[in-house]
Amino acid sequence: MDTSKVHGNVKPFRCPGYKQASSPSFSPDACRCPHWHHLALKSGCAGLILLLLSLIGLSVLVRFLVQKPPIEKCSVAAQENRTELTGRSAILECPRYWHPHWNKCLFVSQISRPWAEGRDACSMEDAILLLIENKEELRFVQNLIKGKEQLFFIGLKYVQKEKIWKWIDGSILNPNLLRITGKDKENSCAIISHTEVFSDSCSSDNHWICQKTLIHV
């Protein structure tokens, strides 16, 4: 028997459905990322750029805000200076030789005249004879003239028809405020010392005390 023919007619045995495995083949685009990867990469890059721009803008804003307070402080200081100047212009002061007390300026005369002349002298200074409003003011005035031997007219006069003491503004004397020593009679005016208030003739010569409202300077 010719064995060569036998071997030549022999076909290799294959199981049904079996296919010879072939070595994997790779296309040129096999290593490239899918299309959506490219889109994601581009979107990420754009997001990073926007984030970077936002950070730059934020840093500029922070620097501006940090530098702004000194400017505002200068503005506030300028405003305070203007307010201070305005406040100075609104300061209330008394004229020379006048004594401040609360909202009043008081003037103690250096000469003696009758009550009416003292009243007129006060009027020439845009003032009136003193109106004592309370006990505290009474003490202040008596301390002001303490050590002086003179007596001083004030804006208090006896009204014979009404049998009462009245201040020159028309108000009636409160007896709890002042106790007047002397007679209550016509043409009587009140004079004050550093200890008491007396009744004296309005025609007698005495010093006087004027008052006026504090003025703006």
Curated annotation (Swiss-Prot):
Matching entries from SUPFAM superfamilies are given as:
C-type lectin-like (SSF56436)
Please provide the record's keywords in A-Z order: Disulfide bond, Glycoprotein, Lectin, Membrane, Signal-anchor, Transmembrane, Transmembrane helix
The protein's matches in InterPro entries, at most eight in alphabetical order, are given as: C-type_lectin-like, C-type_lectin-like/link_sf, CTDL_fold, KLR_subfamily_B, NKR-like_CTLD
Compartments annotated for it: namely: Membrane
Q: Which cysteines are joined by disulfide bonds?
A: C122-C210, C189-C202
Q: In which tissues is it expressed?
A: Highly expressed in dendritic cells. Detectable in natural killer cells.
Q: Name one Pfam family in it.
A: Lectin_C
Q: Which PROSITE patterns match?
A: C_TYPE_LECTIN_2 (PS50041)
Q: A single Gene Ontology molecular function, please?
A: signaling receptor activity
Q: Which residues lie on this side of the membrane: Extracellular?
A: 67-217
The record's function comment reads: Binds CLEC2I/Clr-g leading to activation of natural killer cells or costimulation of IL-2 production and proliferation of T-cells in response to antigen stimulation. May contribute to the formation of the immunological synapse between T-cells and antigen-presenting dendritic cells.
Q: Which PANTHER family does this UniProt record tie to the protein?
A: KILLER CELL LECTIN-LIKE RECEPTOR SUBFAMILY B MEMBER 1, KILLER CELL LECTIN-LIKE RECEPTOR SUBFAMILY B MEMBER 1F
Q: What is this protein called?
A: Killer cell lectin-like receptor subfamily B member 1F
Q: What is the lineage of its organism?
A: Eukaryota, Metazoa, Chordata, Craniata, Vertebrata
